[in-house]
Amino acid sequence: MSNFVPHKIDSDTSFESDLLGEVKAGFPSPAEDIREKLDLIKLLVKHKAATFFFRVDGVSMVDCDMDEGDIIIVDRAIDPYNNCKAVCFIDGEYTVKRVEMLGSKVRLMPANEHNTKYQPIEVTPDNQFIIWGVVTYTIKKM
């Protein structure tokens, strides 16, 4: 994540669209009437002042369904927890990884079993380290 430029949610940001109902993944059925309004910000963002959007740069997290070019939603108000996916700052660089917490030890785990280039990062007291925010959603282009 060398191009670390978060996109912040403004307090008046809203994106509302019509929710048409459920769609069957099997045999198609005729479209139903509009059931309700769907506000994507209300659905995807719990803490507007602490939520940011990032575009994924790289392939170290593909096994967690974070592919290059996807948008991740990161909430800084959520306390990190074991095995959460998070944007972390370590030694001057930002990265997104799965955070493994084992007692007082922290490891940043990549999720790409097909590429041995990505190895776990053991966080030590010598590292400059913070968990910047927890990933809450991934928005994918199909």
What are the residue ranges of the model-derived segments?
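Glycine- and charge-enriched low-complexity intrinsically disordered segments
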Residues: 101-142
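Short, compositionally biased
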Residues: 82-96, 100-106
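Hydrophobic beta-strand signal
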Residues: 73-74, 87
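Structural motif
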Residues: 69-70, 84
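Short, positionally conserved secondary-structure boundary motifs
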Residues: 1-62, 101, 128, 137-142
